[in-house]
Amino acid sequence: MDLEKFRNDVYEMTEKLSKNLKENDRSKLNYVCQQLIEMYKKNLVKINHSVLELICASNLILRGYSVEVEKSVSDILVCDIYAKKGGGYTIIEIETGFTPPDHAMDTVDYYAARIMSKIARYSQHCSKFSLATPVMGILPIPKIFLLPPNARKKEDVDKVKELCDRYYKNPPIKYEDILNAHLHSIYLINIDKGFAKELDPQGYVDLTQSLLERSEIEY
């Protein structure tokens, strides 16, 4: 653990991002920065993920949100970004595409199931749920989450649940959580330039669909 290097890196990114914020909003980003430093001391975060969280937090603060990171929202769930504005709550989960060695032989299915499970589990704890990813990655967004709950077919919900059940058993993902899940947006994060751009889910799928189809990935 190199606390000095971590602190220097998050301070550097915070200073860079603060240039785009109003003076009275900079303290909100500094609060997030200090949260991350304290969590690093407890070995709860890593620098690559922390930088992504800072960029997403800056985007939300710019739009009037108050932001916390690594916040517990249930007995088993800790979200990356938890933001409040007025009476509404936003959760952002950042996906980098990492998969553990245990799933070296089923990486695509595992990754898709993780995305499905996050949408199903986290979206019930907020008014708006979003996924975020570095610009180098592509998220396989299941088509079912582009539809409102009343337009989702039972066989499509069952298909998502069957895949999730392969990887999530304790506890399993509930049928009702998949049926009622909602995905508000996708954030594309440019780490080098320090910004995140928000896309609606349908727009993101339209942009990435042909690449995923070439790779024979469809959920």
Can you say where each PLM-predicted feature lies in the sequence?
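Interdomain/boundary linker segments immediately adjacent to catalytic/signaling cores
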Residues: 1-63
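Active-site beta-strand-loop-beta-strand hairpin of nuclease catalytic cores
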Residues: 75, 79-100
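Amphipathic coiled-coil/heptad-repeat helices and related helical stalk/stem segments
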Residues: 53, 75-77, 114-115
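A conditional alpha-helix N-cap/helix-loop micro-motif detector
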Residues: 49, 72, 111-112
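Catalytic cores of nucleic-acid endonucleases
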Residues: 96-159
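Non-catalytic C-terminal interaction segments of nucleic acid-processing enzymes
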Residues: 2-30, 136-219
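A structural signal for short, well-ordered beta-strand segments and their strand-loop junctions
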Residues: 68-69, 91-93, 130-133
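Short phosphate-binding/catalytic loops that engage adenosine nucleotides
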Residues: 64-65, 127
